[in-house]
Structure formats: C-alpha cells, structure tokens
UniProtKB/Swiss-Prot annotation:
Cross-referenced Pfam families: Fuz_longin_1, Fuz_longin_2, Fuz_longin_3
Keywords: Cell projection, Cilium biogenesis/degradation, Cytoplasm, Cytoskeleton, Developmental protein, Protein transport, Transport
Molecular function terms from GO: phosphatidylinositol binding
Assembly and oligomerization: Component of the CPLANE (ciliogenesis and planar polarity effectors) complex, composed of INTU, FUZ and WDPCP. Interacts with CPLANE1. Interacts with CPLANE2.
Any GO BP annotation: regulation of smoothened signaling pathway
Keyword ATP-binding: no
Protein's UniProt name: Protein fuzzy homolog
Disruption phenotype: Embryonically lethal. Embryos display severe developmental defects, including neural tube closure defects, abnormal patterning of the spinal cord and the limb buds. They display polydactyly on all limbs and defects in skeletal development and organogenesis, including malformed sternum, ribs and long bones, as well as severely hypoplastic lungs and conotruncal defects. The number of hair follicles is also reduced. Defects in ciliogenesis are clearly noticed and result in abnormal hedgehog/smoothened signaling.
Membership in a protein family: Belongs to the fuzzy family.
UniProt subcellular location: Cytoplasm; Cytoplasm, Cytoskeleton; Cytoplasm, Cytoskeleton, Cilium basal body
Native source organism of the sequence: Mus musculus (Mouse)
Function: Probable planar cell polarity effector involved in cilium biogenesis. May regulate protein and membrane transport to the cilium. Proposed to function as core component of the CPLANE (ciliogenesis and planar polarity effectors) complex involved in the recruitment of peripheral IFT-A proteins to basal bodies. May regulate the morphogenesis of hair follicles which depends on functional primary cilia. Binds phosphatidylinositol 3-phosphate with highest affinity, followed by phosphatidylinositol 4-phosphate and phosphatidylinositol 5-phosphate.
Tissues where the protein occurs: Expressed in dermal and epidermal cells.
C-alpha cells in the first residue's frame, strides 16, 4: 500500500464507442491538472485493443504493466472511458469507481440523451467542456472521498438541530423539497428530500458546487444521472458566507429573483454565529472540542445504509505525515479493506449459498506501514458503520481494536 510519487501521472480518455473519435483527454500529475496529452497513436491502440476484444465477445476490463494500471469501461454502448494511472499502489477499484463518477458527471452536465445518441461530435465536445472542472477534481488529490466510497461527504455542525429546523422551514417557504447547506463540497444539513436523492447525484451535486469558482448566486441546469437523466432540473446556489452555500434543486420555480436578500436575512440572520462556526468544518468534519484520542491522525467513518461518511484529518504536532499523505493513506487503506476484508453485501444468490456454507465475516483488521514509517491503520465494523483510523507509531498494536471500537462508539450518535 504505497504512497505515490509527486509526479505520478493519471490520464483519462473519453471516446465515442462506435467511431473511436476522442471526445476529450484530461490529465493530472502529482494531483494537479496537467497539459500533458497522450499521443494519438497510444489513444488509438488503447481503444483498438478494447474493440478487438469486444468483437471476439471478450470483455477487457483492466490491464497492468510494470508501472501503469489501465481500466476500460463502456457506457450504454456509446461512450468508452479509459483511465491510465502510474500512481504506486493504485487499485482497480478506485479507477473503476472514478470512471463511473466521470460518466455520472458527463450525464449531470449534458444529459444522457446527448451521450447515447451522438448526432454531432463537435457540438458534444463543446458541451462537455462545462464538465471539465468537475472531472478534473476526480483526477486530483481531493479532500473529499465520496468518489471512492460512493457515500456523501458530510460534516457535523455544532448546532445541527437548529440548522435542520431552519433549513426545513426555508424549504417550505420556497416550495422545494430538495435543499442542502454545503461547506467546501460537504453537506452540513439537508432536507429529507435531498437525502433521498439516488446515487451518483447525491455525491455529484455537492462535489460540483465545491468545484465551481465562488459566486454569490447561480442558476445552473443539471440532469440527475439516476433520477432524471433526460430532463434537466435547476440547481440554485446562494452564498451565505464565503465557502458556505445554500443549494436548492428545483423545477421552473422558484425564480432566482424570488430568493431576495430580505427572505435570506429573515431565515438565516439568526443563525449567523452557528453558520460561522461551520466554516472550519471543511478540512475537519467534526466540531471543535470533540474528544478524540491524541494518537488519531485521521479517520474515515461510513454509514453503509445511509450512504454518508465523515472524512477528517486531525491536527497533530508531528509534521509527518502531511494532511495530503494522510488522506492518500486512508484512501488506499479503504480500497484494501473494501476489496479484501469487508466486501460489499452479497446478492441474493450469494446469500442463498451462504446459508449452506456460512462464511466468517471479519470484524476488524489492521496494517502497520514500514519500514521506517510505523504509522498504523485499523478498520472496525459494527453493524451498519465502518470506521478506518490512521494512528501514530506510538499506539500499541495490541490496543488498536479497542481504541477503534471506543472511537466508533463515540462517533455513532453523530452519523
């Protein structure tokens, strides 16, 4: 479970499946967008070998070379996405989920009809440019993790009940059931209607808002990849404080002009101080003063049924690992845990088989990084919650499970 080098490139290719015409190519290096492009001959070869397999009824999903992992994915027999990553320790699970998020982002911006019934390639290329900012965020070193976990990134506000009550009242006053409050792409509070949004739009909408340049207000047309892939909705955003945005998903009404300053002030001025207290909750998902063990460097908590997660890095006197390294280590550990120790729930056929041959499901696992690092990672699952911790080298190995269990019990009332 290595830590990739600073300049490890990732390339994403999007092609029309029938013709092989490239629609776009996006790249990143060291987590930042890059202008580096793959030669057309390489693009043609990667698409050609995939099409060759399809003609022989062979499904080519992934391949590995000495230093690169390649994953192919075809969507609706119309769009082919290919991702190449030279990052050390990159898993196929991460790349597969990235491709699903990328296609979801494309549907979110241009709609499914434009992607499955391509009439004009050049026009589609231009329309897809609006999705580049969102797509590039999947290639970089994001502070979010919903693209990998397929859970909504959340934070826990200090006065959550008051915010929830105000949000519900505001939603009723504006006549829309889908309202949320976001800080840096994470959900602070949301109405029941917003929480009922399907995947992937439940993850994509906050991620989209977090990837856009700051604006006081927006009226943004979006399609819902799961709920409404062919009919657009309106995503209205209003900035309450810098970095803190109110989002409404609605139809033709209300018009943006109806959300005037007087209406906003009436609902949100009484909560000004609690709103300000939410601003630091971007990088740290937990309210200030929440008791966590001093050895905890970072954590990921998932509610597997609600599809929500908390992803936070804790302040530490130690300079190493950096917050970016901690996020990367936890992301890599999650892919290991999800593919090896805590796989997704089995389907009906698998459950039937399990009744005959019951399998033992693990409750916890841990990993010690080395040599010379000593950082420890532990995962524990209790019921519908899964907790992953990154711990300092000072933590005794025999106490990892106990510490993780106590931490999970303390966090359970929050998520």
């Amino acid at each position: 479970m290595g830590d990739e080098g600073p300049g490890s490139p990732v390339h994403l290719l999007c092609l029309a499946a029938s013709s092989g015409v490239p629609l776009f190519c996006r790249s990143s290096s060291g987590g930042a967008p890059s202008r580096q492009q793959l030669p057309f001959s390489v693009i043609g070869s990667l698409n050609g070998v995939h099409m060759f397999g399809q003609n022989l009824d062979v499904q080519l999903n992934s391949a590995r070379t000495e230093d690169t992992t390649v994953v192919w994915k075809n969507f609706h027999d119309s769009i082919t996405l290919i991702v190449l990553s030279s990052e050390e320790g990159t898993s196929e699970l991460r790349l597969e989920r990235m491709l699903h998020m990328v296609f979801g982002a494309m549907v979110l911006i241009v709609g499914l009809e434009e992607l499955t019934n391509i009439r004009n390639v050049e026009r589609l290329k231009k329309e897809l440019r609006a999705s580049y900012c969102l797509i590039d965020s999947f290639l970089g070193n994001s502070e979010l993790i919903g693209d990998l976990t397929q859970c909504v990134d959340c934070v826990i506000p200090p006065e959550g009940s008051a915010m929830q009550e105000t949000l519900s009242g505001f939603a009723e006053a504006t006549g829309t059931a889908f309202v949320s409050l976001l800080v840096s792409g994470r959900v602070v509070a949301a109405t029941e209607g917003w929480w009922r949004l399907g995947m992937p739009e439940a993850v994509l909408l906050p991620w989209l808002v977090g990837s856009l340049p700051p604006q006081a207000a927006r009226d943004y047309p979006v399609y819902l990849p799961h709920g409404s892939p062919t009919v657009p909705h309106r995503l209205l955003t209003l900035t309450l404080l810098r970095g803190l945005e109110l989002c409404l998903l609605c139809g033709p009404r209300p018009p943006l002009g109806q959300l005037d300053p007087q209406l906003m002030e009436r609902w949100w001025q009484p909560l000004l101080e609690p709103l300000r207290a939410c601003l630091p909750l971007g990088p740290r998902a937990l309210p200030e003063g929440f008791p966590l063990h001093s050895d905890i460097l970072g954590l990921l908590l998932l509610h597997l049924e609600l599809r929500r997660c908390l992803f936070t890095m804790e302040p530490s006197k130690d300079k190493e690992p950096s917050p970016e390294q901690r996020r990367r280590l936890l992301r890599n550990f999650y892919t290991l845990v999800a593919t090896t120790h805590f796989p997704p729930e089995p389907g009906p056929a698998e459950k039937q088989e399990d009744t005959v041959y019951p399998a033992q499901m693990p409750r916890a696992c841990y990993l010690v990084l080395g040599p010379g690092m000593g950082w420890q990672l532990v995962a524990v699952q209790l019921g519908l919650r899964l907790l992953l911790l990154l711990l300092s080298p000072h933590t005794p190995t025999h106490g990892l499970r106990s510490l993780a269990t106590r931490t999970l019990q303390a966090l359970t009332p929050l998520l």
